[in-house]
């Protein structure tokens, strides 16, 4: 039963992911980002929502996919099976 429940990931992992996302938020001039990290057994679920505006440096789908790949590669050293979902929206309501 314990393995079916989602638990908070280790603080060190959560902090590392938060710092990565904060840096990307600044680099691409996103208005805000929301990050959720949880653990189930050997799986790590990472959900990142970027809220962008007219000043954001990313618009095209290809650019979004390259950023997803950049984030995934930046997390490759974390020894969990990762499930990564990254969304982009102008409306924060879709991220909450």
Features from the language model and the residues they span:
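Alpha-helical transmembrane segments and adjacent TM-loop junctions that form the membrane-embedded core
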Residues: 1-96
